[in-house]
Amino acid sequence: NFVKTMLNLTATKPTLNVVFDQAGTPTYALDLAVAIKAVLDDYAAEQPKQGYSKTGVYHFSNEGVCSWYDFTKRIAELAGNTECDIQPCHSNEFPSPVTRPAYSVLDKTKIKQTFGLKIPYWTDSLKVCMANMDALKK
């Protein structure tokens, strides 16, 4: 998982180059699970024998936008890993057989409007995620 990897790298490496030219939205698995439960609860309440009216494709991710660089900086900041010099770099500096889009932010309008979801920002969910990870260590 990216958070665990960056926690380790920012705690052990003096410098770290991280891609800044690809934007997306980190998604906390717990937030996704809560959204899935809300959809399933809605489905169960609507008596599916009569046909479920809210079909289609729904996108979900946390709110906000960041680059991998921004994400890593925030992880290091929250962890107090201030010794690592995190530097932005271009994605072409990390050759990959997989082509990734420069902008991969999902439109969540449909899922928010259909199910009345209040989706947390990635920065807030990252704090919760890291607190939960820390609690599991104890």
Where are these regions (language model features)?
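NAD(P)-dependent short-chain dehydrogenase/reductase
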Residues: 1-24, 30-38
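Amphipathic terminal alpha-helices
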Residues: 122-138
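A hydrophobic C-terminal alpha-helical subdomain
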Residues: 93-114
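Residues that recognize and position ribonucleotide moieties
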Residues: 16, 25, 64, 87, ...
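Residue-level signal for the nucleotide or nucleotide-sugar donor/cofactor binding architecture
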Residues: 24-27, 66, 106, 117-120
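Mid/C-terminal beta-alpha module of Rossmann-like enzyme folds, strongest
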Residues: 35, 42-97, 137-138
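Tryptophan-centric aromatic hotspots in well-structured domains and transmembrane helices
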Residues: 2, 68, 121-122
